[in-house]
Curated annotation (Swiss-Prot):
Pathway: Amino-acid biosynthesis; D-alanine biosynthesis; D-alanine from L-alanine: step 1/1
Organism, scientific name: Staphylococcus aureus (strain NCTC 8325 / PS 47)
Residues modified as N6-(pyridoxal phosphate)lysine: K30
Source lineage: Bacteria, Bacillati, Bacillota, Bacilli, Bacillales
GO molecular function terms noted in the UniProt entry: alanine racemase activity; pyridoxal phosphate binding
Protein name: Alanine racemase 2
Amino acid sequence: MTATWSVNKKIFLQNAITVKNNQPLMAVVKNNAYHYDLEFAVTQFIHAGIDTFSTTSLREAIQIRQLAPDATIFLMNAVYEFDLVREHQIHMTLPSLTYYYNHKNDLAGIHVHLEFENLLHRSGFKDLNEIKEVLKDHHHNQNAKMIISGLWTHFGYADEFDVSDYNVERSQWMEIVEALLSEGYQFDLIHAQNSASFYREGQILLPHHTHARVGIALYGSRPYSSLNQHDIVQSLTLKAHVIQVREVQAGDYCGYSFAFEVTKNNTKLAVVDIGYGDGILRTRAKHEALINGKRYPIRALMMSHMFVEVDGNVHAQDEVILYNNDIRIDEYTFKGVGANSEQLSAMNHDSLKKEYISNDC
């Protein structure tokens, strides 16, 4: 038996349609589409009516171009392979004044999106004056030059409700957008909203915006806990099997380095064929697994195995669910296991069997 990572294609597609809510989305497909597989995700998103994509990798951007010849593809990281960016008609961020002045000749013919730094401080122009400096210099540049097609930022605090930072970054951003538009500047694409912001705004675009740039919600995880589970549906299942059930006694230690001390006689431990080598985070192993519709506590994690404390209703060959729509990735995000994307990224697709299921089972 081999632990299996599987995605229900119909549920994945329907979730994307529901998330889109008839709004223009830029689907974030970075890191191999959150490890759902880039080709699979792009194909499904196209079926859902999405024709604009973003990633952080030039290699992935080129792959998307091969999959979607007519799509708009936005590269969120600045790169230096300018000929490749031009050749594949990829849009790219313009991250700073320094980058602009160092490479404005290299950028000739490339579509760029001016990036506002905002509270995240990861990349971008620091204020309106820096953005206008580029716009003015670009206007007076008589040489072959870049094409300013977009304006964007990233909200780093849209999933935080106990602080005012989202309102601050949203307000600062809207002031930038409205100031530029009021001075007659025009942009084909204006985008800022991530999944959390998109849902906080009622699944509609902010004023003047052309797209919401949505990632994790498209993959079936809620960006914050107060959202109803029915609003975003997980299509992913991660399952393993019980190899055998062992009976242990009070005082026994099970697992490496005294991982679990047994406190009751005749305790039953299911040995399950999945472990941290398959991508189960140690923080996830502090919680439960689902067997025959019931949750049981995980007691120890090893490279290729785990111990789950069970009862007499669990037997060899029973399925053990680590994730599905009843025991969701986002549930464990909110319990502190790790970000949705962190749990997805940890899974080892070289050791897990991968399946894409075409029906509702």
